[in-house]
Amino acid sequence: MTGTENHPQWGLARVHGRSMTPTLTPGDRVLVRYGAPVTPGALVLARLPDGTLAIKRAREARATRSGGPGWWLLSDNAVEGVDSRHRGVVADESVLGVVRLRVWPRPRRL
């Protein structure tokens, strides 16, 4: 994974929206490991093709339209949120990190 040169190794992110319910809810704070290898099923912080930062679930590795490596990212709540069903495959360099745990309000590993 690339695209993390200007990021710290670890960081906090705040959840906005309901696209990842019931796993994450609005206002949750999560710990992100930037540059961590992505595996299918992992929660990731990604920059979607429209520039939006979002937490989504990495479903599977897929090629982008240009043939480069990427990920098919989905919302846990299929009724809400925008994901690869709407925006297509997200390039590897746009997958910024892996969400390791929720730190607030109820800490738990993800």
Go through the PLM ranges and name each one.
Residues 1-110:
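Extended hydrophobic leader/signal-anchor segments used for secretion and membrane insertion
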